């Protein structure tokens, strides 16, 4: 008999939920405040009240064994000796509109818990109590119904019989999919060099899974240079492992949309090579990008009265799923949009609902790692999931950003102005919070006066200490570090967080009472900003610091996650195994440390391309340190000219900053006007990015030199194969700009392991260097030249970070030697 694991809430909501998507402001964060209220009510219930009781049972229906699991909010025995199952719900519905039958799902959930508990405890009957907590009035409204064990059993059996056709569909598909994947063949005639090795590593990691002596399943770091075919080398073995019963679902997580497209293309290749392949996939895209009915400002308007795709969504979604799940499907962005129009359902929510029925889910990192937007339907508990994390070198910075939060004082000032004249509870709360942040701004200026000069990472500005006999305007804790109008504290001051928390309730009231006000959108944005900072305060621990920065009249408060390791570790622990891969994951000790995978296996594969196809040169007589940049401009221009004059073609020059890029470009364009150039501008959208890259045509009649920024949109994730790019120059070692935040990061890791400069500057910088250099040579037939410009490339601290296929680097003493070496390379 087939077995289906089914969370109780999922069973109830799938069958009984009706109506529309409605994302209007409801006055509270359901997940966070709801949990707080649950704990508050559970604690107030007394000693005999059992909170969060885990219940599990196996039940048969229609020839299927269902394993049901869930947590009852509370179980207790009342004064009459009757057992009561308590189901707690927080709501913004006005008290007078809260009725006994306003949501059938609520009763159903309590009744299923009651059926399980009554059977396990041999209870002839029990009570189910709905406890509604009205968040605006703090009013508690309760409804109680008595059920016999027979009534509860019959109700549960009815639900399972209704769900059985869907379960049978899942069972039949799982069998078909597993058999199909077991017979899956590699879609190419042969493996590329290194491809079989990478595939083998990932296959073994997926098979080992939870049996490994490693927290949360097996972890693997794989550095795979350009050309190995990382996407197929990861997907194919993971799918083969699934075909052997190792993993229920595969999540392919990326940092960029271009990488998602690569995963979609790889799956299409598998389907083309094996048309009978039974495999479903879905690509999850941000709501703003897939919305079919945005408002006048281009934002999703997820209200039933405004959007036909939101109106009645839950009444139509099962019909849509029935039709879409009849066969194999790859639901990318275009396919979801087409299906959404066909069935008149929201494409974003359709993608989420389809993900439960798909074998491969492709999406951004945030769907797993972000504490706010992660896929709760999967990752609120662990499962037999396989995680493939592409471009994993991007994950440390992305993770830090996900767990951090930022708040600006100006948002309070602007909110007060938007409210106009007159007194109100909201204005009073805004004024108090604004005043608290104003005092903090004064304290920042006193603790860390601004310095106008910038320095190098190797020679940072000195800490600015509080002058003697000076009393700060606000009593802040002893700072960890203070510089350039920025103060870092070990703990967030309650003098700032308390008034911000106090803003929430009156702000909620105002938003609910004034849905059509002109200032509603602005104050809603403020509400979410306050919510973000209070959420971050909930998870704040020793891996965070508080950053206060004064800029003019602005005060910026950040709860800054310096070390995301425990949070990334906890996210990965939700799955069976995780393979994190990139062309640049060196040194592995750094990535294992900052991503919480200390026990992970790490492998580095050799480049599949012949070393002689890459001309690799360095001019170590140029310093691009910040203090030397102005003096280096002409030398850099001359070196770039020698690089591109050696052979007609397309080239890129990558710089550590826009300012330095513009300095060199101005000089280069003036002194070498015969060479065509393109300059990367900041904040390019997708269309402008595509237009820029379209200039890099195959076999050009004239040379083109693009000026770009390391770590930017052209410095990685760009595939210009063949003659579309035959060379690049890397100007500098890519160190992040020296600023108080980077210095705090350095100090943190100095205290943790003594490698602060490496963790904050050198390793991230060299990662950008290697990514940029990897734009050259994309296929075995490509030939190209890479020029490194900086004396630090000749230092052992940097040489030890070079990949194995850079062993043949040549250090040259002048532009004349460079020209001769390039001529020799291209003539071979």
How would you name each of these model-derived features?
Residues 178, 185, 246-361, 369, ...:
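A substrate-engagement module of RecA-like helicase motors
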Residues 57-154:
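Mg2+/Mn2+-dependent nuclease catalytic core
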Residues 173-223:
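Conserved pre-motif I regulatory segment
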Residues 1-78, 82, 108:
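Metal-dependent nuclease catalytic cores that hydrolyze phosphodiester bonds in DNA/RNA
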Residues 336-361, 371-378, 506-623, 631-633, ...:
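A contiguous, basic/glycine-rich beta-loop/short-helix subdomain that forms a polymer-engagement track
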Residues 620-631, 682-793:
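Conserved RecA-like P-loop NTPase helicase motor core
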Residues 234, 261, 341-360, 365-502, ...:
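Signature of the SF2 helicase/ATPase Hel1-core->accessory helical subdomain module
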Residues 656-681:
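Conserved helicase motor "Helicase C" RecA-like lobe of SF1/SF2 P-loop NTPases
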């Amino acid at each position: 008999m087939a077995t289906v694991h089914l969370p109780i809430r999922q069973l109830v909501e799938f069958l009984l939920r009706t109506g529309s998507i409605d994302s209007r402001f409801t006055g509270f964060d359901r997940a966070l405040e709801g949990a707080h209220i649950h704990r508050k009510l559970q604690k107030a219930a007394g000693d005999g009240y059992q909170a969060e009781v885990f219940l599990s049972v196996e039940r048969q229906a229609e020839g299927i064994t269902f394993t049901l699991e869930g947590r009852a909010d509370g179980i207790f025995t009342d004064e009459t000796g009757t057992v009561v199952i308590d189901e707690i719900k927080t709501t913004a519905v006005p008290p007078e509109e809260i009725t006994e039958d306003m949501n059938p799902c609520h009763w159903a959930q309590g009744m299923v818990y009651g059926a399980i508990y009554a059977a396990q405890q041999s209870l002839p009957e029990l009570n189910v109590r709905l406890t509604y907590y009205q968040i605006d009035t703090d009013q508690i409204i309760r409804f109680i119904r008595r059920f016999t064990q027979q009534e509860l059993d019959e109700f549960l059996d009815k639900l399972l019989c209704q769900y059985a056709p869907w379960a049978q569909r899942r069972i039949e598909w799982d069998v078909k999919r597993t058999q199909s994947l077991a017979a899956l063949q590699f879609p190419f005639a042969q493996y590329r060099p290194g491809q079989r090795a990478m595939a083998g590593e990932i296959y073994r990691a997926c098979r080992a899974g939870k049996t490994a002596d490693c927290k949360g399943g097996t972890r693997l770091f794989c550095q795979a240079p350009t050309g190995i075919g990382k996407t197929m080398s990861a997907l194919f073995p993971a799918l083969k492992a699934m075909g052997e019963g190792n993993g229920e679902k595969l999540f392919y997580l990326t940092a960029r949309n271009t990488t998602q497209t690569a995963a979609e293309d790889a799956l299409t290749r598998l389907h083309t090579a094996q048309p009978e392949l039974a495999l479903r996939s879905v690509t999850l895209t941000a709501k703003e990008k897939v919305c079919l009915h945005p408002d006048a400002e281009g934002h999703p308007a997820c209200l039933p009265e405004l959007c036909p795709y939101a109106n009645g969504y839950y009444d139509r979604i099962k019909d849509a799923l029935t039709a879409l799940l009849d066969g194999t499907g790859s639901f990318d962005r275009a396919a979801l949009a087409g299906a959404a129009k066909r069935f008149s359902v929201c494409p974003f929510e359709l993608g989420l609902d389809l993900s439960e029925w798909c074998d491969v889910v492709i999406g951004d990192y945030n769907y797993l790692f972000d504490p706010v937007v992660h896929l709760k339907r999967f990752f609120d508990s662990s499962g037999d999931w396989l995680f493939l994390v592409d471009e994993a070198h991007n994950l440390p910075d992305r993770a830090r950003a996900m767990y951090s939060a930022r708040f600006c004082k100006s948002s309070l000032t602007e909110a007060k102005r938007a409210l106009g004249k007159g007194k109100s509870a909201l204005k009073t709360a805004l004024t108090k919070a604004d005043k608290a942040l104003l005092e903090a701004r004064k304290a920042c200026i006193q603790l860390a006066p601004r310095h106008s000069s910038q320095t190098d990472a190797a020679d940072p500005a000195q800490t600015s200490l509080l002058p003697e006999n000076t009393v700060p305007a606000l009593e802040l804790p002893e700072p960890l570090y203070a510089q350039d109008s920025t103060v870092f504290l070990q703990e967030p001051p309650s003098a700032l967080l308390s008034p911000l928390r106090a803003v929430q309730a009156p702000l909620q009231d105002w938003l609910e009472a004034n849905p059509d006000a002109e200032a509603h959108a602005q104050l809603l944005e403020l509400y979410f900003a306050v919510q973000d900072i209070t959420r971050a305060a909930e998870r704040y621990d020793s891996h965070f610091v508080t950053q206060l920065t004064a800029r003019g009249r602005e005060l910026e408060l950040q709860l800054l996650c310096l070390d995301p390791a425990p949070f990334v570790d906890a996210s990965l622990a939700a799955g069976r195994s995780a393979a994190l891969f990139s062309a640049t994951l060196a040194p592995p000790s750094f990535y294992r440390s900052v991503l919480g995978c200390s026990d992970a296996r790490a492998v580095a594969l050799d480049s599949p391309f012949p070393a002689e196809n890459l001309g690799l040169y360095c001019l170590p007589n140029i310093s691009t340190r910040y203090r030397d940049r102005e003096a280096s401009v002409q030398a850099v221009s001359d070196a770039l000219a020698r690089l591109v004059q050696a052979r007609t073609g397309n080239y890129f020059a990558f710089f550590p900053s826009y300012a330095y890029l513009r300095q060199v470009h101005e000089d280069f364009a003036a002194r070498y006007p015969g060479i065509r150039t393109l300059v990367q501008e900041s904040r390019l959208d997708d269309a402008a990015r595509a237009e820029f890259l379209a200039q890099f045509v195959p076999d050009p009649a004239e040379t083109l030199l693009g000026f770009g920024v390391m770590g930017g949109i052209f410095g990685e994730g760009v595939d210009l194969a063949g003659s579309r790019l035959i060379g690049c120059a890397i100007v500098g070692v890519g160190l992040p700009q020296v600023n108080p935040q980077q210095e705090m990061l350095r100090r943190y890791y100095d205290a943790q392991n003594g490698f602060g400069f490496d963790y904050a500057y050198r390793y991230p910088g060299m990662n950008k260097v290697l990514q940029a250099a990897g734009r050259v040579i994309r296929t075995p037939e490509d030939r190209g030249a890479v020029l490194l410009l900086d004396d630090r490339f000749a230092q052992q601290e940097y040489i030890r970070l070079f990949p194995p296929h850079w062993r043949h680097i040549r250090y040259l003493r002048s532009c004349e030697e460079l020209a001769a070496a390039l001529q020799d390379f291209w003539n071979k």
